[in-house]
């Protein structure tokens, strides 16, 4: 890259010189005859037997920058303590020493080279400015350090390339003694337009036809090398391309900004009034909170209190299962409970369910978020219930008792029984939330496809213990303890009026009783489809929610309030008993 930059600079200066000569010829036509006459007289004098004094053309040869100087300049620019912006005169004074003098033109040439390589950004002096120094405005330390590391390798590559070029020139010129010429540095002034014009004039004045042909071939070979290097330089990203990329990034930022409608939907579901949750203290107990702080009083966050019984051995540490332990009456490990005053417990009670405005909204996408219909449920065996009497729903959620080959405190369904459930009749357009675990993940995906749903998302429930830490000793899992559960989200038809992008697909919540899913899923579904009819399958008493109809064999009787559903239920089951059909 160093040789390429030097040749391009030399080529640029020679082009400028040729342009000046052409302009002078246009202004003074007699100068052309003078130059031609001087060429003819020179050729006539060369034919005389006496010694002729031939003045060589005064072509300014620019020596390439010293590699050591380039390395020193890279090291100077890569210093983190360098104050920017700085000019080329200041850099020249810093690098100039008595042992190795440095010229201002070399420093400017190297700075322009580094700018072309996108190592630094420079600003050239204006035409009207009296200063001729180049201003360095910013540097890329990462690229500079990479260039310093690869300096040794690049020098070895340059030496090898120079030797290859010399060998190639010798092959192009041939081995005839009459045409031998002293070796010159590769890819220098021989590729310039001035040298090419001089060689053409010499050939036309009677200098040997064979030598001119071979010199022309050599010029073509070297010109091809220069063309390749110029092409590699032109392939770098231009200022216009960089500006276009910057505009694209700004457009992407604008597209990622939420619109006024999205902000309005988020504001609609924002919690009103005081906060309904309290934050736990990171230190656990009040004693540890006081010891870690500078104040004699604990913080206002929620703390835990140790439960120390007669059989408790504090040296054993905390129980792995904490408040989910099955043997708390005899467990020797330490357990915890919430440490809060009695008045705080009374204030923590939320508003009564009866205070909510009641109303049934069966239209998908109803914006009346605050209107809720009372909870309804039916105690039954879902395999035998004719679910067509319940109508259509916008959202269906199911937590099936999968047969996962474990000892569970409830009955399970076989894989075939799960596949035969009449889920498709519950929806024409909407969403299905299906909880799966263990080997049931693949079976759940199969059931989604069988029931006519396309899986579009998957919610992860990360389980935490009573102390709000990730559990490490779960009771599920064969090879690894399971610390999470999955909820597959399927879509059917073309649902309209649902809110997109309000929640993420991760729930972090505390573990409670067996198969007790987090209550956060209900808020997530309500924000997705506010005010619509929803149904939950395989529910238990703690799953009963407003706007939901819950089906399960552990519920308390039958509680229906929707007049249309009540009429269809009485017509289908006059005696109120849901029994197994005779054809099953």
Curated annotation (Swiss-Prot):
EC number: 2.1.1.348
Signal peptide start and end residues: none
Recorded superkingdom: Eukaryota
MF annotations from Gene Ontology: mRNA (2'-O-methyladenosine-N6-)-methyltransferase activity; mRNA binding; mRNA m(6)A methyltransferase activity; protein heterodimerization activity; RNA methyltransferase activity; S-adenosyl-L-methionine binding
Sequence motif Nuclear localization signal, residues: 213-220
Gate loop 1: annotated segments: 400-414
A GO-annotated cellular component: cytoplasm
Chief localisation class: nucleus
Region annotation Disordered: where it falls in the sequence: 1-65, 162-221
Region (Interaction with METTL14): 454-458, 468-484
Catalytic activity: an adenosine in mRNA + S-adenosyl-L-methionine = an N(6)-methyladenosine in mRNA + S-adenosyl-L-homocysteine + H(+)
Keyword terms: Cytoplasm, Differentiation, DNA damage, Methyltransferase, Nucleus, RNA-binding, S-adenosyl-L-methionine, Spermatogenesis, Transferase
UniProt-annotated location(s): Nucleus; Nucleus speckle; Cytoplasm
Region (Gate loop 2): 511-519
Tissue occurrence: Expressed in the hemato-vascular system: enriched in sorted endothelial cells and haemogenic endothelium.
Region entry Positively charged region required for RNA-binding, spans: 469-482
Function: The METTL3-METTL14 heterodimer forms a N6-methyltransferase complex that methylates adenosine residues at the N(6) position of some RNAs and regulates various processes such as the circadian clock, differentiation of embryonic and hematopoietic stem cells, cortical neurogenesis, response to DNA damage, differentiation of T-cells and primary miRNA processing. In the heterodimer formed with mettl14, mettl3 constitutes the catalytic core.
Domain comment as written in the entry: Gate loop 1 and gate loop 2 regions are adjacent to the S-adenosyl-L-homocysteine-binding site and display large conformational changes upon ligand-binding. They may play an important role in adenosine recognition. The interface loop contributes to the heterodimer interaction.
Complex and partners: Heterodimer; heterodimerizes with mettl14 to form an antiparallel heterodimer that constitutes an active methyltransferase. Component of the WMM complex, a N6-methyltransferase complex composed of a catalytic subcomplex, named MAC, and of an associated subcomplex, named MACOM. The MAC subcomplex is composed of mettl3 and mettl14.
Protein name (database record): N(6)-adenosine-methyltransferase subunit METTL3
Species for this entry: Danio rerio (Zebrafish)
């Amino acid at each position: 890259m160093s040789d390429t930059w030097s040749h391009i600079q030399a080529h640029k200066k020679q082009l400028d010189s040729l342009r000046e000569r052409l302009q002078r010829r246009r202004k003074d036509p007699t100068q052309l005859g003078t130059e031609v006459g001087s060429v003819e007289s020179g050729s006539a004098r060369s034919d005389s037997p006496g010694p002729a004094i031939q003045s060589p053309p005064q072509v300014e040869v620019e020596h390439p920058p010293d590699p050591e100087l380039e390395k020193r300049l890279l090291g100077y620019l890569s210093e983190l303590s360098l104050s920017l912006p700085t000019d080329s005169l200041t850099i020249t004074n810093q690098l100039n020493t008595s042992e190795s003098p440095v010229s201002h033109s070399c420093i400017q040439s190297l700075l322009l080279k580094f700018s072309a390589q996108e190592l630094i950004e420079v600003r050239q002096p204006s035409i009207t400015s009296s200063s001729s120094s180049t201003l360095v405005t910013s540097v890329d330390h990462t690229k500079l350090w990479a260039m310093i590391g690869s300096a040794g390798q690049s020098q070895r590559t340059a030496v090898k390339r120079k030797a290859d070029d010399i060998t190639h020139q010798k092959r192009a010129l041939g081995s005839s003694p009459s045409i031998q010429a002293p070796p010159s540095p590769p890819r220098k002034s021989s590729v310039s337009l001035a040298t090419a014009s001089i060689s053409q004039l010499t050939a036309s004045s009677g200098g040997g036809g064979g030598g001119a042909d071979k010199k022309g071939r050599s010029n073509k070979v070297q010109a091809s090398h220069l063309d390749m290097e110029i092409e590699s330089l032109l392939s770098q990203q231009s200022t216009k391309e960089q500006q276009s990329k910057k505009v694209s990034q700004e457009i992407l930022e604008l597209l990622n900004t939420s619109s006024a409608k999205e902000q309005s939907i988020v504001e609609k579901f924002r919690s009103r009034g005081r906060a309904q949750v309290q934050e736990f203290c990171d230190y656990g107990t009040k004693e540890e909170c006081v010891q870690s702080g500078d104040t004699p009083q604990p913080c206002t966050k929620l703390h835990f209190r140790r439960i120390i019984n007669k059989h408790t051995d504090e040296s054993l540490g905390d129980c792995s299962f904490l408040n989910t332990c099955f043997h708390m009456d005899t467990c020797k490990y330490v357990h915890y409970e919430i440490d809060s005053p009695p008045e705080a417990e009374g204030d923590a009670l939320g508003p009564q369910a009866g205070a909510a405005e009641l109303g049934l909204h069966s239209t998908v996408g109803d914006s009346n978020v605050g209107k809720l219909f009372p909870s309804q449920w039916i105690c039954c065996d879902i395999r035998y219930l004719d679910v067509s009497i319940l109508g259509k729903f916008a959202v269906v959620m199911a937590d099936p008792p999968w047969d996962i080959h474990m000892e569970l405190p409830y009955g399970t369904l076989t894989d075939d029984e799960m596949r035969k459930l009449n889920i498709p009749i519950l929806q024409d357009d909407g969403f299905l939330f299906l909880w799966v675990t263990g080997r049931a993940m693949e079976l759940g995906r199969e059931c989604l496809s069988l029931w006519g749903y396309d899986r579009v998302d998957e919610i992860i429930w990360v389980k935490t213990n009573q102390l709000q830490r990730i559990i490490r000793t779960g009771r599920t899992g064969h090879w690894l303890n399971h610390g999470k559960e999955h909820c597959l989200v399927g879509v059917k038809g073309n649902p309209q009026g649902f809110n997109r992008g309000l929640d993420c697909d991760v729930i972090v919540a505390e573990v409670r009783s067996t198969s007790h899913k987090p209550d956060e899923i209900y808020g997530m579904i309500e924000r997705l489809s506010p005010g619509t009819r929803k149904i939950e399958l395989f529910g238990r008493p703690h799953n009963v929610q407003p706007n939901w109809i819950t089906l399960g064999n552990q519920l308390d009787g039958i509680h229906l309030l929707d007049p249309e559903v009540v009429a269809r239920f009485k017509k289908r089951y006059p005696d109120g008993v849901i029994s197994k059909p005779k054809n099953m």
